[in-house]
UniProtKB/Swiss-Prot annotation:
Protein name: Small ribosomal subunit protein uS17
Keyword Lipid biosynthesis applies: no
Record flagged with keyword Protein biosynthesis: no
Gene name of the record: rps17
Record note on quaternary structure: Part of the 30S ribosomal subunit.
An annotated GO BP: translation
Function: One of the primary rRNA binding proteins, it binds specifically to the 5'-end of 16S ribosomal RNA.
Signal peptide annotation: none
Cellular component per GO, a single term: cytosolic small ribosomal subunit
Organism of provenance: Methanoculleus marisnigri (strain ATCC 35101 / DSM 1498 / JR1)
Keyword annotations of the record: Ribonucleoprotein, Ribosomal protein, RNA-binding, rRNA-binding
Family: Belongs to the universal ribosomal protein uS17 family.
Short name of one Pfam family: Ribosomal_S17
């Protein structure tokens, strides 16, 4: 049975046995919720999500494009792949670099 994680996201239809799943496991989510594009899924159970944003440069009165990358845990019930636009939520540290978990695949 899936539990409510406190975010307005649809609950996945398939169930998984992952302990670090926010829906079927015991992982609590809190903090930031970020939308980005999956650029790599080659790690086991982890995806790299890239977010582009505009940063204002005061000296030139212009905007420049910047991007940041986040490592996010991808559970078997969500199954995010390269090119998917996903929503990730902050959680406790799962490894040295992984502090986020995928909670929704918005577009494939």
């Amino acid at each position: 049975m899936a539990r409510n994680i406190g975010l307005d996201v649809p609950i996945p239809e398939t169930e998984c046995e992952d302990v670090n799943c926010p829906f079927h496991g015991t992982l609590p989510v809190r903090g930031q919720v970020i939308t980005g594009k999956v650029v790599s899924d080659r790690m086991n159970g982890t995806v790299v999500v890239e977010r582009e944003f505009l940063h204002y440069v005061k000296k030139y009165k212009r905007y420049e494009k910047r991007r940041s990358r986040y490592h996010a845990h991808s559970t078997p019930c969500i199954n995010a792949g390269v090119g998917d636009v996903v929503r990730i939520a902050e959680c406790r540290p799962l490894s040295k670099t992984t502090n986020f978990v995928v909670v929704e695949v918005m577009t494939e």
